[in-house]
Structures are given as structure tokens and as C-alpha cells.
């Protein structure tokens, strides 16, 4: 029994990994020196709650910062500033000797080069094969289990 199309799982994993590499949780990958982390930051209205939920292929963890009786945490307290450091500290311990692990790309997913004017952000964008813009010459996604040359 499969809950969702493997292509959806792969695309979501890719988007959530981008959060920990280029987005509001980029400190996770840079601090832990891993590319296989994924997650989502969150901050409620009026900065009452801050959270980060993230995972690696072998472990999932969430960090929530707030008060039992809701009140403002402070204007600078967000998921990326208040909750993420706790998550990073926990994951540093549980992933200490765990090698990086990535979902393999399923059949039917292709990548196209991602033009970026800033040089920041993902080098490729993923598509269902049948929805890829043909003029951008789709090809198989990058195998993230292969470490780039230093």
C-alpha cells in the first residue's frame, strides 16, 4: 500500500531540503555539515509560537518554543531563530555517526537547470516528466548521494 505517488514524496523532500540549505533554516545544513536535512520553520501571529519540524531519512524531530499561556515571544523570535537552534543541537547528537542518506529519484521525475540571478538557490528545479518545459532540456535529477568535489 502506497500513501502517495513516489514522485510527490521526492518533490516534497527536495523542496523541504531547500529550506535547510537556502531558506529560513539554512543554518541547519551549514552547522551540521549535512545536505540530507529537510524541514519547515513556523511562526504564529504576534510571535506567540515558534517552531521547526525537520527530518533526515532515519529520524524526525520538532522543536516548539512558546508559553503555556500564550504571549508574545518578542519581535525577533521566529522558527528559524528561536526553535531551530534546539533542533540543531538535538540532531547533532542523534546523527553523530549516521551517514548522509537521500531518497533515490523515482521514475518520471526530471530536472532542469535553474537560472538564478543571485547565484543563491537550487541549481535545478524538478518536474514530473510530463510537465517539464521541453525547451529547457530536462534530464535526470542530480544524485545527491554523490558528494561534490571540494
Task: For the regions a language model picked out, list residue spans one by one.
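A conserved catalytic-loop motif detector
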Residues: 1-41, 45
Amino acid at each position: 500500500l502506497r500513501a502517495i505517488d513516489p514522485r510527490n514524496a521526492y518533490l516534497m523532500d527536495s523542496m523541504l531540503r531547500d529550506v535547510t540549505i537556502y531558506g529560513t533554516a539554512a543554518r541547519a545544513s551549514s552547522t551540521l555539515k549535512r545536505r540530507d536535512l529537510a524541514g519547515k520553520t513556523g511562526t504564529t501571529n504576534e510571535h506567540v509560537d515558534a517552531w521547526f519540524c525537520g527530518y533526515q531519512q532515519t529520524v524526525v524531530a520538532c522543536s516548539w518554543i512558546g508559553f503555556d499561556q500564550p504571549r508574545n515571544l518578542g519581535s525577533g523570535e521566529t522558527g528559524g531563530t528561536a526553535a531551530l537552534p534546539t533542533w540543531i543541537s538535538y540532531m547533532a547528537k542523534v546523527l553523530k555517526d549516521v551517514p548522509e542518506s537521500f531518497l533515490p529519484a523515482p521514475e518520471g521525475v526530471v530536472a532542469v537547470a535553474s537560472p538564478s540571478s543571485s547565484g543563491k538557490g537550487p541549481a535545478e528545479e524538478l518536474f514530473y516528466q510530463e510537465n517539464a518545459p521541453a525547451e529547457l532540456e530536462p534530464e535526470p535529477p542530480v544524485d545527491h548521494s554523490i558528494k561534490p568535489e571540494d
